């Protein structure tokens, strides 16, 4: 019975985005984006990406990142910033890249939060 309850709780958390695959570091992500010359990858679907994305971001879904990353980021020690809708898919992509040996992967979390933080920084 406890095992079933635990599974239900984990399922609910996963569906709300509260159980994330990787730790979100939005502040560091924004800092590197503002410095420029940092690879930014939107891991959402092509349809989501077409609806709006950060300027200069590439679109590689979290399901395709392992196959496509070396073509855009051959240096495994260079910073790579990931984001998605909630931070969950970018967390999954972060874990994938770290398993492939990438050392500076930052899960910047949700696009809408990044956009709001950028606007706040510009208005100061």
Predicted regions and their residues:
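Rhodanese-like catalytic fold shared by cysteine-dependent sulfurtransferases
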Residues: 2-4, 17-38, 47-79, 88-124
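Bacterial N-terminal signal peptides
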Residues: 7-17
């Amino acid at each position: 019975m406890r095992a079933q309850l635990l599974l239900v709780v984990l399922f609910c958390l996963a569906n709300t985005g509260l159980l994330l695959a990787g730790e979100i570091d939005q502040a560091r992500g924004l800092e590197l984006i503002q410095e420029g010359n940092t690879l930014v990858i939107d891991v959402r679907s092509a349809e989501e990406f077409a609806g709006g994305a950060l300027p200069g971001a590439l679109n590689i879904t979290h399901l395709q990142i392992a196959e496509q990353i070396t073509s855009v980021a051959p240096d495994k020690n260079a910073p790579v910033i990931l984001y998605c809708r909630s931070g969950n898919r970018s967390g999954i992509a972060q874990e994938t890249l770290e398993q492939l040996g990438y050392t500076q992967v930052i899960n910047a979390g949700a696009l809408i939060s990044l956009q709001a933080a950028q606007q706040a920084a510009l208005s100061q």
